[in-house]
């Protein structure tokens, strides 16, 4: 065996010196996973709140209280000395949402009837910003005033159109099967000069339809959005509400805060009406029906999209869209704190057809 020669004093050696600190290797950023749809690679993106999201960081409670003074009596300090609210209290959540809309989006009137869905605005805004990125990727010189969007299930809160109009100047149609939701959403639009002329609310008269009965024969939409019903039955929805409330109360007790609201008092922030929360077959059935109907409007809509709450439903939805002939599918994940959500977007038009769409200035 050859014995390695010891280097002479001052002579360089290739042997690595021992060190107390570990050697840190430069890590390359991993590329997001992709899948191919008829020749196109599609990325699944995961990140935190969008850079353009106005709700990054802590809530500015002094500013929020200034625009909605009623919020002040609902604000408290957590054990860390940070201002917050009791998110198990429906009135607190509603007032926070109202203040966020007034402060950040210039809304002068916003309200929802008792028992209707009061969605977390930061996550809803993230969906719109990432949809905007999808459109900008296909057309970097996008004129946002040319974008026409359709929100399926606009709800009484009208959140997606509000964000889309105030942030980007898009025009919207919001549909819903519930007459009260349409009435309230219309009142919000009529009561805000910023929204007037930019949002139209339409009643879906057939609860078995999604796009049929809403998209007119000569209408074209740049994109559709949707927050689909998650549960398969009223019982499932009630159990889900109770589970969320229990988890939140346990978390608050752990942080030294009292959490007393019961299920009957939590309908506003965790609840919602039938069409908002459940439908036969749950989320999988709803988005499956949406996929099938979307094929009928393949040439009238550039991009379809919907949130998917249950990660297990993504794979089935992608397979169904591929069978239906979708040319491009994007699965975009979003992170709000510890919560991961995602939406899926698809188009039946290939890259060249999408380019021609923009050239036609829809």
UniProtKB/Swiss-Prot annotation:
GO biological process: rRNA base methylation
Signal peptide: none
A UniProt-annotated Pfam family: Methyltransf_10
Listed GO MF terms: 23S rRNA (adenine(1618)-N(6))-methyltransferase activity
Annotated keywords: Cytoplasm, Methyltransferase, rRNA processing, S-adenosyl-L-methionine, Transferase
Enzyme Commission no: 2.1.1.181
Stretch list, region Disordered: 1-40
Gene Ontology cellular component annotations, sorted alphabetically: cytoplasm
UniProt subcellular location: Cytoplasm
SUPFAM superfamilies, per database record: S-adenosyl-L-methionine-dependent methyltransferases
Lineage: superkingdom: Bacteria
Basic residues biased stretches: 1-28
Catalytic activity: adenosine(1618) in 23S rRNA + S-adenosyl-L-methionine = N(6)-methyladenosine(1618) in 23S rRNA + S-adenosyl-L-homocysteine + H(+)
Family according to the record: Belongs to the methyltransferase superfamily. METTL16/RlmF family.
PANTHER family linked: RNA N6-ADENOSINE-METHYLTRANSFERASE METTL16, SAM-DEPENDENT METHYLTRANSFERASE
Role this protein plays: Specifically methylates the adenine in position 1618 of 23S rRNA.
UniProt xrefs under NCBIfam families: PRK11727.1 (NF008725)
Protein name, UniProt field: Ribosomal RNA large subunit methyltransferase F
Species of origin: Vibrio cholerae serotype O1 (strain M66-2)
Gene that produces this protein: rlmF
């Amino acid at each position: 065996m050859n014995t390695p020669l010891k280097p002479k004093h001052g002579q360089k050696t290739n042997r690595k010196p021992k060190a107390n600190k570990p050697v840190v290797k430069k890590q390359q950023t991993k590329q997001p996973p992709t899948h191919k749809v008829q020749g196109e690679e599609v990325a699944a993106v995961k990140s935190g709140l969008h850079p353009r999201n106005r709700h990054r960081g802590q809530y500015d409670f002094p500013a929020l209280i200034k625009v909605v003074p009623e919020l002040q009596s609902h604000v408290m300090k957590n054990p860390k000395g940070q201002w917050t609210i009791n998110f198990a209290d429906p009135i607190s959540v509603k007032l926070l949402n109202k203040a966020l809309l007034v402060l950040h989006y210039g809304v002068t009137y916003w309200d929802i009837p008792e028992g209707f869905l009061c969605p977390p605005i930061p996550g809803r805004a993230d969906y719109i910003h990432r949809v905007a990125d999808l459109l900008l990727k296909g057309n970097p010189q996008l004129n946002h005033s040319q974008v026409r969007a359709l929100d399926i299930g606009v709800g009484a809160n009208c959140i997606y159109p509000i964000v889309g109009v105030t942030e980007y100047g898009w025009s919207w149609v919001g549909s819903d099967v519930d007459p009260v939701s349409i009435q309230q959403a219309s009142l919000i639009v009529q009561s805000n000069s910023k929204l007037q002329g930019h949002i139209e609310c339409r009643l879906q008269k057939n609860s078995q339809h999604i796009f049929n009965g809403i998209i007119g024969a000569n209408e074209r939409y740049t994109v559709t959005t949707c927050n689909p019903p998650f549960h398969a039955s009223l019982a499932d929805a009630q159990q889900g509400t109770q589970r969320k409330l229990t988890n939140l109360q346990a978390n608050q007790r752990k942080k030294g805060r009292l959490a007393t609201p019961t299920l009957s008092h939590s309908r506003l922030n965790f609840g919602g009406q039938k069409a908002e929360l459940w439908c036969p077959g749950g989320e999988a059935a709803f988005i499956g029906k949406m996929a099938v109907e979307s094929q009928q409007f393949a040439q009238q809509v550039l991009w379809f999209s919907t949130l998917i709450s249950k990660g297990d439903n993504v794979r089935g939805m992608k397979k169904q869209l591929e069978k239906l002939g979708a040319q491009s599918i994007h699965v975009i994940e979003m992170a709000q704190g510890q919560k991961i959500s995602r939406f899926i977007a698809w188009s039946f038009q290939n890259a060249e057809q999408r380019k021609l769409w923009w050239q036609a200035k829809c």
